[in-house]
């Protein structure tokens, strides 16, 4: 709303008697515009004195005095004369009962509260909100009372004063109940504002049990006919819902909520849209999706923003399972990525996902692998390697046994899936021998499957001790036998 109601000079719904020709009104109007001219010229102290003369000319409280006080509040706020500003504000609040219309006073006071909300002096803001609420006890302006209380509640949230916030929420909920003591569904929009406050509080407290309950209520309220929520409120609810889902491991639901939050923030022009887009990318990585989130029409315009570029680089490194590149990107973008507590909360999970994929790739060709070798390759402690292996066994179905005494990872010899640990060399004089893979940190033992393979591959007995030379026909025979093995053990072998 900004200066629209802080600096206006038009008639906003006033009903005047036919007194346009009265001399006092003309004098006050002229004095008001003289003061505005001084303010425009930067002569602020002179402007304040000139605005005060408007109040002196005013016999009965009316529009010109109300407008003059708004201007003086604005000037003294800019000068950081906060005590004087509060004095003018208290004086202005005496006008809201009868001097100006209810609608105009409501919009003007909302504009003033929005205007001073840029101050980082939380005690000043609290004083302003509480002063407004005191003045509204007799004014009977429910909408202004509700809006002021929600602003005060947001302030308590920013200050992490959750006990005070809970008290505000209770008062707001009472105002939304009908005569039977039930929530008045006609006040769906107000209920959503209350839920948004609660949801933010429970998200910050990581109280998922309470958060789920309020989130469900908010989701129901969104679909009521009486609810016409501001996109900013919807964005807040969806963002917190996404955080809740992500912490619960429901990555797909989180992805959906973050995308909805991003769209709502974008519609309202909120800077939170960029933050939520980063959360969307985070969820996209955790669901291990190959779909680029920036392919959507809504997200595409933000693709080249510096903070988002860093996230897209992270996605590429993540999909490539490139641990070194991933860590370098996080280190290079501490301010835009790691400064966010929520993203930081989940980066270790992303790193573990990458390490797990690299781990599986490292052990795939072998039946036995040393834990120390994996530790060296992954650049983590042996304890962390064991932790990753346990997760891979439980979550990814890895068929392996951890032998901590020998420091080895052992693959079961009776597993159905064939592990290509050695290459069988058909030899007439030395049937069934194997040529072991001798990569560092690994060892190879013929499993049951390998033994079966050796016996099938040994071929017809040789007539001499020399190695057989295979003709093209002989190779075809071997190929047919290999196909037979593959159909029996359910895997493909590449020679």
Curated annotation (Swiss-Prot):
Entry GO terms, CC: COP9 signalosome; cytoplasm; nucleus
Start-end of Low complexity biased regions = 442-455
Q: Where in the cell is it found?
A: Cytoplasm; Nucleus
Q: The organism sits in which domain of life?
A: Eukaryota
Q: Please tell me whether the keyword Metal-binding is annotated for this protein.
A: no
Annotated region (Disordered), positions in chain: 1-26, 426-468
Alphabetical keyword list: Cytoplasm, Developmental protein, Differentiation, Nucleus, Oogenesis, Signalosome
GO aspect biological process, one term = oogenesis
Q: Which Gene3D superfamilies match?
A: 1.25.40.570
Q: Which residue numbers delimit the PCI domain?
A: 254-416
SS bonds (residue pairs): none
Compositional bias, Polar residues, is annotated for 430-441
Provide the primary localization: cytoplasm
Instruction: Report the family membership.
Output: Belongs to the CSN2 family.
Task: Give the quaternary structure.
Answer: Component of the CSN complex, probably composed of csn-1, csn-2, csn-3, csn-4, csn-5, csn-6 and csn-7. Within the complex it probably interacts directly with csn-1, csn-3 and csn-4.
List the PANTHER family hit by this protein, alphabetically: 26S PROTEASOME NON-ATPASE REGULATORY SUBUNIT 11/COP9 SIGNALOSOME COMPLEX SUBUNIT 2
Function of the protein:
Essential component of the COP9 signalosome complex (CSN), a complex involved in various cellular and developmental processes. The CSN complex is an essential regulator of the ubiquitin (Ubl) conjugation pathway by mediating the deneddylation of the cullin subunits of the SCF-type E3 ligase complexes, leading to decrease the Ubl ligase activity of SCF. The CSN complex plays an essential role in embryogenesis and oogenesis and is required to regulate microtubule stability in the early embryo.
Q: What is this protein called?
A: COP9 signalosome complex subunit 2
This chain's source organism reads: Caenorhabditis elegans
Gene name for this UniProt entry: csn-2
């Amino acid at each position: 709303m900004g200066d629209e109601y802080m600096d206006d000079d038009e008639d906003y719904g006033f009903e005047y008697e036919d007194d346009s020709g009265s001399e006092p009104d003309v004098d006050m109007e002229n004095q008001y515009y003289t003061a505005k001219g001084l303010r425009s010229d930067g002569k602020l102290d002179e402007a304040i004195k000139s605005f005060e003369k408007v109040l002196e000319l005013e016999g009965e409280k009316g529009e010109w005095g109300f407008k003059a006080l708004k201007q003086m509040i604005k000037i003294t706020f800019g000068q950081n004369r906060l005590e004087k500003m509060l004095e003018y504000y208290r004086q202005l609040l005496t006008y809201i009962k009868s001097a100006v219309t209810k609608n105009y006073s409501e919009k003007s006071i909302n504009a003033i509260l929005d205007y001073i909300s840029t101050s980082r002096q939380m005690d000043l803001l609290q004083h302003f909100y509480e002063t407004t609420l005191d003045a509204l006890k007799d004014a009977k302006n429910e909408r202004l009372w509700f809006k002021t209380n929600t602003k005060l509640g947001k302030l308590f949230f920013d200050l992490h004063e959750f006990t005070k916030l809970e008290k505000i929420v209770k008062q707001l909920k009472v105002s939304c109940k009908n005569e039977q003591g039930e929530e008045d569904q006609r006040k769906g929009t107000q209920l959503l504002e209350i839920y948004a406050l609660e949801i933010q509080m429970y998200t910050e407290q990581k109280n998922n049990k309470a958060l789920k309950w309020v989130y469900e209520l908010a989701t129901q309220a969104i679909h009521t006919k009486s609810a016409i929520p501001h996109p900013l409120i919807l964005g807040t609810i969806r963002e917190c819902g996404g955080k809740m889902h992500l912490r619960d491991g429901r990555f797909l639901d989180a992805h959906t909520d973050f995308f909805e939050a991003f769209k709502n923030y974008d519609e309202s022009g909120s800077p939170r849209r960029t933050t939520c887009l980063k959360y969307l990318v985070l969820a996209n990585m955790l669901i291990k999706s190959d779909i680029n989130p920036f392919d959507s029409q809504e997200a595409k315009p933000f693709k080249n923003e510096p903070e988002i570029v860093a996230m897209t680089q992270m996605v590429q490194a993540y999909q490539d399972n490139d641990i070194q590149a991933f860590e370098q990107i996080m280190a290079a973008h501490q301010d835009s990525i790691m400064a966010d507590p929520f993203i930081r909360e989940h980066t270790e999970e992303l790193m573990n996902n990458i390490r797990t994929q690299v781990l599986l790739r490292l052990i795939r060709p072998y039946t036995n692998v040393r834990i120390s070798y994996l530790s060296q390759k992954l650049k983590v402690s042996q304890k962390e390697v064991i932790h990753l292996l346990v997760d891979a066994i439980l979550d990814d179905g890895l068929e392996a046994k951890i032998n901590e005494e020998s420091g080895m990872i052992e693959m079961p010899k009776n597993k159905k899936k064939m592990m290509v640990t050695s290459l069988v060399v058909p030899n007439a004089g030395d049937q069934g021998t194997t040529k072991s893979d001798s990569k560092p940190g690994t060892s190879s033992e013929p499993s049951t499957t390998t033994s079966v393979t050796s016996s099938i591959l040994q071929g017809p007995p040789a007539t001499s001790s020399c190695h057989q030379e295979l003709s093209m026909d002989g190779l075809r025979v071997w190929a047919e036998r290999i196909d037979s093995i593959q159909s029996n053990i359910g895997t493909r072998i590449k020679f």
